[in-house]
Amino acid sequence: MLLEAVRTGYENALTSDIWTMELANRSFKAHVDNMVLDMAARLVLVNMLADDKHIALSDSELADCTARADAFYDEHSEDIAYIKKDELEKLFAMMVLSDKVYDELTRSVDTQVSVDEARVIRIQYIYSDKSGDASSKVEKLEKALEEFQAGEDFTALVSKYSDIPDYTAQIGRGELEKSFEDAAFNLDAGQISDIVSCTNGWYLIYCIDDNVTGKAESQIESIIQRRRNEQFEKHLGDFSDGVELIIDDRQWEKLSSQE
């Protein structure tokens, strides 16, 4: 059912032509099918984690799952004739339990976010990629820095020196590479950074606004959600180290070959 639902969603959004497309030298269909297999394996793994952590659905939660599954089955029975009602009930229960495991294991996450951590800033940057001679790439940014300090407009310098046309961004903490982030958040509005080395190249960063108004609340929510995700993935990763899931390749091939 997961496979059919995901396939249908993609087809409704992008038309049936997507199945003739290729993505990274692999058919889009194979890409979607493998994604669904990963989703199914993760669902099973999280339910195993629930058992390990002694987390279970209450009687009322199970009854609600059954009612929702039955209602869905009755409404869509012609479209999902390939699945039995009790199998659908089990799938609904597994998904709800997966959500409950997430909530239970992330309940202790620290929800305190400092004013500085919640800041969102608006920046411009000049980027020099790592192709070619590194010293000449860095020298190019040194020239840009000298010209800015001599009074040249930063936007004009972007057009003159940057390897990419995009040069403006609005960022929060934890979104970009640490060296870039540290340099950007240490700037006050109107200041420019030294040359920043990142894994994909070098940057000069100019701060337009060091605290964009109206963004703190959504940024706090984003930071807390990221903390929850990190904590849950730590639990799941520690548990999965001792688990081996065996996929029945013949059954999966049979299922995924169905149109």
Regions found by a protein language model. Name each.
Residues 1-83:
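N-terminal targeting/tethering segments
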Residues 10, 40, 44, 48-57, ...:
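Sec/Tat-exported extracytoplasmic proteins
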Residues 29, 33, 37-38, 42, ...:
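Hydrophobic (often cysteine-bearing) scaffold residues that line and stabilize catalytic clefts
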Residues 59-61, 167, 193:
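A generic structural-conservation signal
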Residues 63, 138-142:
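Generic alpha-helical structural signal
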Residues 77-136, 175-259:
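PPIase-associated folding chaperone regions across multiple families
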Residues 143-180, 209, 214-215:
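Peptidyl-prolyl cis-trans isomerase
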